[in-house]
Amino acid sequence: MARADGPADGSQGGSQGGSGHRRGGGRAAEAPQRRCLASGRVLPKDQLLRFVVAPDGSLVPDLGERLPGRGLWLQARQDMMAAACAKNLFAKAAKRQVRVPDDLARQVEHLALKRCLDLLGLARRAGAVVAGFEKVKAALRAGEVGLLIQAADAADDGRQKIQALARAVAPQLPVLQFCGAAELGVALGREAAVHVGIAPGRFAEGLAREIRRLAGLRGATVQINEVGRPTEGER
């Protein structure tokens, strides 16, 4: 697999995995932070979702963080989304009337899932992906996996064997899930994919970030992260 460095989606780099860019030999830049409009907490942008208000007053999700206008930031958690909608917090943060879709939570979850699948497809085209039980085993042994993704409907036997190997060769390797084998397969141009290894670098970091945000939106209490550390929203 080819190792990929730099932001996976063309945006500014985040804080996960890697020491960050240095200028003039100084300290690595700290990850940008924003305040969540629901909790009031100041958090790294990696844990937040950006929204903007369109000229007609409608609320627009901006998960890619590229739309013009003042950003409204919300932690990527199901309870934060529910609170923001129920308490009219988008309008309060924007200091104007805001039209919020009734199905905003569903829309944002769909967009977050699409970002995960699209990024996985980009990683495949960049040569940063291996898929299949034997290929993933070989890549793990060679130290060529920065993120392990397993299908939500993977058989327990195969899942446990891959996780046992990951624990043995890379105890800190994140092991995540976010969809079934069929959806993984579509993103990778094949019928199905159960075990997927992502090369260390920008794609592994970007996918881990997006999958964790998606899990938070779904109210996930546990990811298949027996190998890596738990993250915000997995409580």
Q: Where does each model-flagged region fall?
A:
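N-terminal cysteine/histidine-rich coordination modules
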Residues: 1-87, 92, 96
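Short active-site oxyanion
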Residues: 70-71, 126-127, 145-147, 170-174, ...
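Charge-patterned, long linear interaction tracts outside catalytic cores
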Residues: 224-235
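Short basic, glycine-rich beta-strand/loop surfaces that mediate nucleic-acid
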Residues: 170-215
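Short helix-coil boundary/hinge micro-motifs
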Residues: 1-8, 35-38, 144, 160-173
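Extended interfacial segments that mediate partner engagement and assembly in macromolecular machines
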Residues: 79-151, 155-158
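Amphipathic alpha-helical transducer elements in NTP-driven molecular machines
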Residues: 29-36, 69, 130-133, 156-159, ...
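Signal for well-folded cores of large energy- and translation-related assemblies
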Residues: 44, 113, 121-125, 140-141, ...
